[in-house]
Amino acid sequence: MGTLGKAREAPRKPSHGCRAASKARLEAKPANSPFPSHPSLAHITQFRMMVSLGHLAKGASLDDLIDSCIQSFDADGNLCRSNQLLQVMLTMHRIVISSAELLQKVITLYKDALAKNSPGLCLKICYFVRYWITEFWVMFKMDASLTDTMEEFQELVKAKGEELHCRLIDTTQINARDWSRKLTQRIKSNTSKKRKVSLLFDHLEPEELSEHLTYLEFKSFRRISFSDYQNYLVNSCVKENPTMERSIALCNGISQWVQLMVLSRPTPQLRAEVFIKFIQVAQKLHQLQNFNTLMAVIGGLCHSSISRLKETSSHVPHEINKVLGEMTELLSSSRNYDNYRRAYGECTDFKIPILGVHLKDLISLYEAMPDYLEDGKVNVHKLLALYNHISELVQLQEVAPPLEANKDLVHLLTLSLDLYYTEDEIYELSYAREPRNHRAPPLTPSKPPVVVDWASGVSPKPDPKTISKHVQRMVDSVFKNYDHDQDGYISQEEFEKIAASFPFSFCVMDKDREGLISRDEITAYFMRASSIYSKLGLGFPHNFQETTYLKPTFCDNCAGFLWGVIKQGYRCKDCGMNCHKQCKDLVVFECKKRAKNPVAPTENNTSVGPVSNLCSLGAKDLLHAPEEGPFTFPNGEAVEHGEESKDRTIMLMGVSSQKISLRLKRAVAHKATQTESQPWIGSEGPSGPFVLSSPRKTAQDTLYVLPSPTSPCPSPVLVRKRAFVKWENKDSLIKSKEELRHLRLPTYQELEQEINTLKADNDALKIQLKYAQKKIESLQLEKSNHVLAQMEQGDCS
């Protein structure tokens, strides 16, 4: 679990009054203490509180602590002494006793006071409970057992007829409170900038990027409440602690985003530019005193997937490497983060700490000090120390950040950081960018010299609702800034620039109008990309195996040719899909496992059976073929251009990151193997040609690629997509509105007729199913009778 893993390898055993054991545990921490040598504000506050508590600071029984809290109130309900003991007791009591058990002890004291006819003590007990409800009312909303015990107390007081006491311990106002911890600072549009706010990564200044990352970090940090820190200590993990889980996901997401943005550039020079930009972002984060995001950025740049890029590092100036070394030294874990602790202690006003380091301190303190001292006394010193450290973190949330955030850029970054990669996947991309030298020993993913994934054992949970919300907000911001004529479309160039700000490397877009992208299309793009990378989309993953193809084969994912002599690509053992190495993790189609004994229809019977069904399915997804004529299926069926033909643009950003706009025509049929031999250049086959044209070739020099014929023993795998690439003037590709208006759509009567036909077919199938079930039952009955008859014959013989 990263930094915290060692502290959580074994479950904590509660110690009850063993002085020798407690001394051994305390002496186990020599000079390398988790706390800085110089006194901090928390230590000074702790010393003052110890003095104010007097004899209780050395340890006291639980009953004495409860009695001291009750006696803190006078007859009118006012505090007659410091509230420090009340604060410590009501916030940290869960370390030694649950909230319901503490309230049960208070109820017992109330019953004893009633029995002794002591109304003054009963009133003070109710004042204590009222203080608990008023100051820490969140406990009563989150703890079901505490709520049930409180209801028992209210029923007891009501049964005794004490109306004043009932009003004091009333909890009905809790439900009226807005207990969600939302960021009070409103996001304002950055109107101080003269230029238009850019949503493009390449146009963002390091200062802008660092400010908005700080805003997101502070927004997440501010939502971690006092009880969240306490729950982390008591439960020993961040499960069932959503605010802390989100903080972990943000920190790890920023680190992955930094790595992927560097690796998304195709050349070493461009990768070096992104690397330099993130170093400048780190410098700005240091100036803003945002150490948590600084740790994430530097950790991402120091990760082995980036540090191994020798060609990229050769383009990084010496001054930048020097700054990286200084930042790494600042955040180094040597001497228990002594450099960071010194720098953090010197900071004033707004600052965001490295949360993992301070949580490690809390765990060290929680594990090192016993809960109880000798004679069963509660270790008040431990409660005070934990209370002061948590309070110091909570007080940082009250200082507003010295920056102004732009709502649109916040939405863009929020979606960009929704990443769900593993280290192996990132390292694979790094190896694809710069293959390792065969003479050098193979590298494996290693941890950076600074701690980033301080709780790497906790992986963010991809939530479809959250992703959908982030996508919708980002799309609204994109059209607000780039849809100038407000017609609901943005240009292809603008979309490609925006998409370059994300580490998504491949996705398919259906376009209503060539050259323009609508709101629905860009929403579908990011939703599909997010679902792919958050592992939400594929319910049945493929079982890809590296394969050597003996005949020409195309990738079923990107329609590209599988080049090479041996091991050209990957083939799914279950469904037979073929793809490139870089495409196998980007497949959006689920694995459709083949039947063991498929029924092979004859070549002549092409109008019925699975072949015709697959062809009719494939016809709905057909794309424009050459304009000279209809595209012909390999089995001889031709499909004319019509309303069922759709344009599709595929963004290809593979290892070379070269974007190619493809117009695809998907041929769907059964075939025996993915590697059928086919004529490449020459005469037309019976099925018709597949044209690949280029501006450098004349009409006579056009390359014709013929589809392969149908095999007599087809497999249920769909034929690979074939790409029709055309280099043309973009203006000639834009369809006019008149053409779109003339597209024929089915009438209501035609749809109604088709529905009735399908219903009739469905009814007929139901009748056949019932007949088959009855036939099965009769055969089973005959079988059982036959078995009984054989048994009777055996007995007679």
Curated annotation (Swiss-Prot):
Q: Identify the tissues in which this protein is expressed.
A: Expressed in brain with higher expression in cerebellum, cerebral cortex and amygdala. Expressed in the hematopoietic system. Expressed in T-cells (at protein level). Expressed in NK cells (at protein level).
Keyword hit for Signal: no
Q: Where is this region: Disordered?
A: 1-23, 673-694
Residue ranges annotated for the Ras-GEF domain, each copy included: 205-436
Residues covered by region (PT region): 718-797
Q: Which residues form a coiled coil?
A: 746-786
Q: Where in the cell is it found?
A: Cytoplasm, Cytosol; Cell membrane; Golgi apparatus membrane; Endoplasmic reticulum membrane
- Region Suppress the PT region-mediated translocation to plasma membrane, as annotated, extends over 686-694
Location of Phosphothreonine modifications: 184
Q: Which domain of life is it from?
A: Eukaryota
Q: Name one GO molecular function term.
A: phosphatidylcholine binding
The alphabetized UniProt keywords are:
Calcium, Cell membrane, Coiled coil, Cytoplasm, Differentiation, Disease variant, Endoplasmic reticulum, Golgi apparatus, Guanine-nucleotide releasing factor, Membrane, Metal-binding, Phosphoprotein, Repeat, Systemic lupus erythematosus, Zinc, Zinc-finger
Region feature Ras exchanger motif region, mapped onto this chain: 57-110
User: What segments bear the compositional bias annotation Basic and acidic residues?
Assistant: 1-12
Q: Which GO terms describe its biological process?
A: activation of GTPase activity; B cell activation; B cell proliferation; cell differentiation; inflammatory response to antigenic stimulus; mast cell degranulation; natural killer cell activation; positive regulation of MAP kinase activity
User: Would the keyword Phosphoprotein turn up in this protein's UniProt record?
Assistant: yes
- Domain N-terminal Ras-GEF residue range list: 53-176
> To which protein family does this belong?
Belongs to the RASGRP family.
* Protein name, as recorded: RAS guanyl-releasing protein 1
Q: Which organism is it from?
A: Homo sapiens
Phylogenetic lineage:
Eukaryota, Metazoa, Chordata, Craniata, Vertebrata
* Encoding gene per record: RASGRP1
